[in-house]
Amino acid sequence: MKQYLDLLNHVMEKGSDRGDRTGTGTRSVFGYQMRFDLEEGFPVLTTKKLHLRSIIHELLWFLKGETNIRYLKENGVSIWDEWADENGDLGPVYGAQWRSWPAPDGGHIDQIANLVKGIVNNPNSRRHIVSAWNPAEVDEMALPPCHCLFQFYVADGKLSCQLYQRSADIFLGVPFNISSYALLTMMVAQVVGLKPGDFVHTLGDAHLYHNHFDQAKLQLARRPKPLPFMRIKPDVKDIFGFTFDDFELIGYEADASIKAPIAV
């Protein structure tokens, strides 16, 4: 995807070298935006092969409201292993905030259910927002949310989504985030009876770890291929009813994966 390669190149050429929490060191820019028209194909990297199974199962795990990695491990997904405790728990991370945000009266708010209901009943609202950043619980999370707030927008029979990501690991994290939120947009669009529009990805601290420079240069030397298309079973009309087998990526051709260390 040209949008992603442009981001990589921009950070390599224009970024500032800074320290970071992990001690690895980063080169970063503050404030960057990419836009993907979901009618033009499914936004997934073709300059390195991504593990789509992990992307889909992680999203389904979020939507289940789960915060233990048991479901992920059962489905061969290890991307959260480094942050889980000995019991597999992560604290009140994404799933808890999306599905069970604590309310002042002692109850809980299901932001995803409210989102779908709001789009159906009042599509022109400017309040179709889900937040994973809960200041009251952020210190209890194994990893505070990097992709922390998203908003939906309806126009001309299409549903678009904008994600704000406060912290963006460009080489390892951002490719997953692009595909994950593009897929979420398509899923929500299907259950509310709209066509997918744009996915807009807004980054706060967009950074490339110093030990990812060689991998980034290798990827920048590759030429992007045509985007594939995502086929979703059309009979699923409940946002919580999707399973892994409901998705099929058609025509995905990509260069070999590029390994890089995770900064924990």
From Swiss-Prot:
Keywords: Cytoplasm, Methyltransferase, Nucleotide biosynthesis, Transferase. Pfam families: Thymidylat_synt. Gene3D superfamilies: Thymidylate synthase/dCMP hydroxymethylase domain (3.30.572.10). GO terms for biological process: dTMP biosynthetic process; dTTP biosynthetic process; methylation. Homodimer. PANTHER family: THYMIDYLATE SYNTHASE, THYMIDYLATE SYNTHASE 1. (6R)-5,10-methylene-5,6,7,8-tetrahydrofolate binds at H51, D169, A263. It catalyses: dUMP + (6R)-5,10-methylene-5,6,7,8-tetrahydrofolate = 7,8-dihydrofolate + dTMP. This is Thymidylate synthase. GO terms for cellular component: cytosol. The active site is at C146.
